[in-house]
Amino acid sequence: MPRRRVIGQRKILSDPKFGSDLLAKFVNILMVDGKKSTAEKIVYTALDTMTERSGEECLSVFEKALENVRPAVEVKSRRVGGSTYQVPVEVRPVRRNALAMRWLVEAARKRGEKSMAQRLAGEMLDAADNKGTAVKKREDVHRMADANKAFAHYRW
């Protein structure tokens, strides 16, 4: 940890095809072993598939899916006097996006379709319709936070 100054977060380059920062971040999260071109191919194929299936513009469906998966609150463990409490805390905007993208990718990897592009397209279309595993994950996190509302005063 630097002692002199706080180092700012690096700005990632926008997506070359659509010019979207969110899509560039999504490609980076999907990427495995540094294979960015493969990840881009998967995402672009998934977006094309989404356009064919839904008839809407792919970027708007992608953003709607992200919006439906973004968590507003989450729980963090906090140790107080020998016992651990799950304390509900609000999620910062950058983390909201990161969690939503991570959950979409995880849910897509668990699906049964043949190619990753088809799985990703299916999961994003489901998320845009407020269905699917990623949306269920968000609702589980919200439910946990709601159940532990009594410990909200332990926030730090």
From Swiss-Prot:
Gene3D superfamilies: Ribosomal protein S7 domain (1.10.455.10). GO terms for biological process: translation. One of its GO terms (molecular function) is structural constituent of ribosome. One of its GO terms (cellular component) is small ribosomal subunit. The keyword Calcium does not apply. SUPFAM superfamilies: Ribosomal protein S7. Keywords: Ribonucleoprotein, Ribosomal protein, RNA-binding, rRNA-binding, tRNA-binding. InterPro entries: Ribosomal_uS7, Ribosomal_uS7_bac/org-type, Ribosomal_uS7_CS, Ribosomal_uS7_dom, Ribosomal_uS7_dom_sf. This is Small ribosomal subunit protein uS7.
